[in-house]
């Protein structure tokens, strides 16, 4: 499989065409951004870590029957994935109060929820990716009610798998963001990535943060935090 011309470049990844109409080539970048791109920095090794961690987690999900776009890891920073039409919704699942939810509800960060909360955010940089209700989604016409139901069910299924998997590594899955795509056959599958860029991950005992909040809040060395997650997941750390 050959990497051809650049199709799209986002904050964290570049997407390239391949000679297969059904596949695209993903390259993870070393860039870190926060607050809708207001805070930016290049962090050497971040792309490798996100690629390695996403590979491990997508393979885990595939093992239990959850369909994803992941095909194979190509290099330390690259992977081959199925081409899908991305649904312009970020699906956020929350198990513990943190971040914007703490501010929105006036609840203390770290409060464990009795059951998960699933939220939808409309993917639009100009609007700042606003939180939307299912009624808003219907007005925006970006997903049908049936698709929204599938997204919610898949997010909750993935949540339970990841909660158990991270717990085995002594990590608490606080919350995480997912993106989904539609195949040419009309099937909804998991896309994008699952990494410390898209999850809040805390040590189960100390609540030490191993995610992008380290960068957002200037809490320490981001690569050290991501390396710790990779090590606990059983990947090959470069420390």
Swiss-Prot record:
The keyword Nucleotide-binding applies. Keywords: ATP-binding, Ligase, Nucleotide-binding, Purine biosynthesis. It holds the Pfam family SAICAR_synt. The keyword Phosphoprotein does not apply. It catalyses: 5-amino-1-(5-phospho-D-ribosyl)imidazole-4-carboxylate + L-aspartate + ATP = (2S)-2-[5-amino-1-(5-phospho-beta-D-ribosyl)imidazole-4-carboxamido]succinate + ADP + phosphate + 2 H(+). Its EC number is 6.3.2.6. GO terms for molecular function: ATP binding; phosphoribosylaminoimidazolesuccinocarboxamide synthase activity. InterPro entries: SAICAR_synt/ADE2_N, SAICAR_synt_PurC, SAICAR_synth, SAICAR_synthetase, SAICAR_synthetase_CS. GO terms for biological process: 'de novo' IMP biosynthetic process; cobalamin biosynthetic process. Gene3D superfamilies: ATP-grasp fold, B domain, Phosphorylase Kinase, domain 1. It comes from the Bacteria. Pathway: Purine metabolism; IMP biosynthesis via de novo pathway; 5-amino-1-(5-phospho-D-ribosyl)imidazole-4-carboxamide from 5-amino-1-(5-phospho-D-ribosyl)imidazole-4-carboxylate: step 1/2. Belongs to the SAICAR synthetase family. This is Phosphoribosylaminoimidazole-succinocarboxamide synthase. The lineage of its organism: Bacteria, Bacillati, Bacillota, Bacilli, Bacillales. The gene is purC.
């Amino acid at each position: 499989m050959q990497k051809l011309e650049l199709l799209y470049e986002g904050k964290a990844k570049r997407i390239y065409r391949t000679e297969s109409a059904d596949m695209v080539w993903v390259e993870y970048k070393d860039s870190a951004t926060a607050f809708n791109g207001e805070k930016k920095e290049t962090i050497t090794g971040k792309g490798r870590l996100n690629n390695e961690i996403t590979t491990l987690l997508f393979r885990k999900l595939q093992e239990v029957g959850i369909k994803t776009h992941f095909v194979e890891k190509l290099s330390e920073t690259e992977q081959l994935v199925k081409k899908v039409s991305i649904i312009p919704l970020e699906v956020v699942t929350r198990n513990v109060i943190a971040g914007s939810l703490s501010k929105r509800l006036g609840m203390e960060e770290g409060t464990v929820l009795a059951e998960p909360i699933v939220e939808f955010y409309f993917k639009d940089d100009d609007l700042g990716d606003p939180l939307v209700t299912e009624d808003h989604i219907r007005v925006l016409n970006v997903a049908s009610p049936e698709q929204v139901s599938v997204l919610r069910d898949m997010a909750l299924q993935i949540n339970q798998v990841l909660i158990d998997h991270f717990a085995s590594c002594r990590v608490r899955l606080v919350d995480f963001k997912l993106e989904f795509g539609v195949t040419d056959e009309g099937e909804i599958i998991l896309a994008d990535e699952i990494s410390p860029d898209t999850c809040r991950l805390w040590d189960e005992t100390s609540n030490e943060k191993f995610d992008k909040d380290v960068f957002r809040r200037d809490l320490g060395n981001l690569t050290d935090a991501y390396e710790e997650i990779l090590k606990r997941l059983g990947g090959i750390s470069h420390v």
